[in-house]
Amino acid sequence: MGGQKTHFGFSTVNEDEKAGKVAEVFHSVAKNYDIMNDVMSAGLHRVWKHFTINTAHLKKGDKVLDIAGGTGDLSRGWAKRVGKEGEVWLTDINSSMLTVGRDCLLNEGMILPVSLADAEKLPFPDNYFNLVSVAFGLRNMTHKDTALKEMCRVLKPGGTLLVLEFSKIYKPLEGAYDFYSFKLLPVMGKLIAKDAESYQYLAESIRMHPDQETLKQMMLDAGFDSVDYHNMSAGIVALHKGVKF
């Protein structure tokens, strides 16, 4: 088969195949997503997201776009910050994840606009949002550079992008982290979610994602300024921040 190639975990696939394969993974894990996140990270994902929410300097009435918002953890936090005067969009490219996220928010009495949206072709006008966030979603995108440019496009001048993503762990911990990721994680996926393969992909996709400095440069290339990052949990995850001027 012809066409441009890209990675799907450690495998090489045609670019036009990756989105479908990623979709299969998240259709499979959607119902158990929050449970698995708690188990896999020993609850740390909630700490990472809480830090991300506290990093944003939002005010009442601000507009926020949550990309790859999944089960709505960040959207929930953003909505509390911007109040009823504000606007928070929960978006995801995966219908199963979006349905779970919408239902979770509804169960808490939160009615937010939701959109089935591809981050590489965002259905929003230029210069609209004060904040764009993407948590644990960028690594699954086929054309990360295109997605980052789209995020920049929809931000108002002075607006902020926050990217929370798995990253490059400190070198002395690599051996233990690899054992956990490739030996234990798929077993947990099989026992809890009845799906070892999706969690094997998760481990592989983390290793293929750009490291902290590479992602920083990608954000600069996409049009962001004042780009910096903060490592958490020894570099297991990093929060990148960029501003559109």
UniProtKB/Swiss-Prot annotation:
PROSITE patterns (UniProt xref): SAM_MT_UBIE, UBIE_1, UBIE_2
Keywords recorded for this protein, A-Z: Menaquinone biosynthesis, Methyltransferase, S-adenosyl-L-methionine, Transferase, Ubiquinone biosynthesis
Broadest EC class assigned to this enzyme: transferase
Pathway note: Quinol/quinone metabolism; menaquinone biosynthesis; menaquinol from 1,4-dihydroxy-2-naphthoate: step 2/2; Cofactor biosynthesis; ubiquinone biosynthesis
Coiled coil: none
Magnesium among keywords: no
Gene Ontology MF terms: 2-methoxy-6-polyprenyl-1,4-benzoquinol methyltransferase activity; demethylmenaquinone methyltransferase activity
Annotated organism of origin: Neisseria meningitidis serogroup C (strain 053442)
HAMAP family cross-referenced by the UniProt entry: MenG_UbiE_methyltr
EC number(s) reported in the record: 2.1.1.163, 2.1.1.201
Entries under Pfam families matching the protein: Ubie_methyltran
Entry protein name: Ubiquinone/menaquinone biosynthesis C-methyltransferase UbiE
Signal peptide bounds: none
Superkingdom of the source species: Bacteria
Function description: Methyltransferase required for the conversion of demethylmenaquinol (DMKH2) to menaquinol (MKH2) and the conversion of 2-polyprenyl-6-methoxy-1,4-benzoquinol (DDMQH2) to 2-polyprenyl-3-methyl-6-methoxy-1,4-benzoquinol (DMQH2).
PANTHER family recorded: 2-METHOXY-6-POLYPRENYL-1,4-BENZOQUINOL METHYLASE, MITOCHONDRIAL, METHYLTRANSFERASE
GO aspect biological process, one term: aerobic respiration
Annotated positions binding S-adenosyl-L-methionine: T71, D92, D118, A119
Catalytic activity reported: a 2-demethylmenaquinol + S-adenosyl-L-methionine = a menaquinol + S-adenosyl-L-homocysteine + H(+); a 2-methoxy-6-(all-trans-polyprenyl)benzene-1,4-diol + S-adenosyl-L-methionine = a 5-methoxy-2-methyl-3-(all-trans-polyprenyl)benzene-1,4-diol + S-adenosyl-L-homocysteine + H(+)
Alphabetical list of InterPro entries matching this protein: SAM-dependent_MTases_sf (IPR029063), UbiE/COQ5_MeTrFase (IPR004033), UbiE/COQ5_MeTrFase_CS (IPR023576)
The family this protein is said to belong to: Belongs to the class I-like SAM-binding methyltransferase superfamily. MenG/UbiE family.
